[in-house]
């Protein structure tokens, strides 16, 4: 496997990593209970997904 000819300096490494950003998760409102949830997932508070009860509350 190919190897780099020269070592990256700390400054170059930090400049390269400056573009690594943490993005906030995209949240949508649940149509049943109006709580915020992740899209395309079962609502953790009411258990509905696509207007159907998927998870039973015990």
Swiss-Prot record:
Assigned protein family: Belongs to the bacterial ribosomal protein bL32 family.
GO annotation, biological process: translation
Database matches in Pfam families: Ribosomal_L32p
Ribonucleoprotein as UniProt keyword: yes
Primary gene name: rpmF
Entry keyword annotation includes Membrane: no
UniProt xrefs under PANTHER family: 50S RIBOSOMAL PROTEIN L32, LARGE RIBOSOMAL SUBUNIT PROTEIN BL32
Gene Ontology terms, MF aspect: structural constituent of ribosome
Superkingdom to which the source organism belongs: Bacteria
Cellular component terms per the entry's GO annotation: large ribosomal subunit
Record's protein name: Large ribosomal subunit protein bL32
Source species of the chain: Caldicellulosiruptor saccharolyticus (strain ATCC 43494 / DSM 8903 / Tp8T 6331)
Keywords: Ribonucleoprotein, Ribosomal protein
SUPFAM superfamilies linked: Zn-binding ribosomal proteins
